[in-house]
């Protein structure tokens, strides 16, 4: 997703007033740094519109990822509402997450790393995500946000738990790991600092 309105809309769905989050950009190339590298920056909710503006200064990049759980507001000082080459600078760790707001389920076709999915593989992943959504809905789960990554699909369930939840989210993700099959890999992303693509 590179459209400014779509990025802003997604971030406003994921975060709320007072939140701080990290944006990470893979294989970025800028006028100042011509080799592919990772860019990282911290943004607060009040400056969400600065994210697409920061992306505009990059000449190219492969993907944009965001920590969907809010981080310690002190981390904003690392790169205030801007991107910078990550280099040896620290990025978000699990201990930097202040609250769990999302449970992520990633459905991707099984394929070699770096290879895009075929149309049939992509549809298979979308069908698997729809099936999981339907199964969980029948168990009383709410409707998730479902996103299409272009290769697969991701389900995002709103939760409200402390960052250190005693392993509750991990236990939940382990219980549903059986949904993987020969064609589609299901990854329940339980680590609190896990990021997701902005597609």
Question: Regions from the language model: what does each represent?
Answer:
Residues 1-151, 158-181:
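Signature for HUH/AEP ssDNA processing cores
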Residues 174-199:
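Flexible helix-coil linker/hinge segments at domain or subdomain boundaries
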């Amino acid at each position: 997703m590179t459209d400014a309105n779509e990025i802003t809309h997604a971030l406003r769905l994921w975060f709320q007033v007072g939140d701080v989050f990290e944006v990470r950009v893979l294989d970025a190339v800028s006028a100042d740094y011509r080799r592919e590298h990772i860019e990282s920056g911290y943004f607060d909710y009040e400056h969400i519109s600065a994210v697409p503006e920061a992306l505009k200064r990059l000449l190219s990049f492969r993907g944009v990822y965001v920590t969907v759980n809010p981080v310690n507001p002190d981390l904003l000082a690392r790169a205030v509402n801007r991107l910078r080459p990550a280099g040896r600078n620290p990025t978000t760790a699990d201990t930097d997450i202040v609250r769990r707001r999302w449970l992520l389920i990633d459905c991707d076709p099984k394929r070699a790393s770096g290879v895009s999915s075929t149309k049939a593989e992509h549809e298979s992943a979308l069908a698997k995500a729809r099936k999981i959504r339907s199964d969980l809905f029948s168990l009383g789960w709410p409707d998730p946000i479902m996103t299409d990554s272009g290769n697969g699909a991701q389900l995002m369930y709103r939760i409200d738990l402390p960052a250190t939840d005693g392993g509750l989210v991990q236990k939940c993700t382990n219980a549903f790991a059986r949904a993987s099959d020969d064609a589609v890999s299901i990854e329940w992303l339980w680590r609190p600092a896990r990021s997701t693509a902005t597609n």
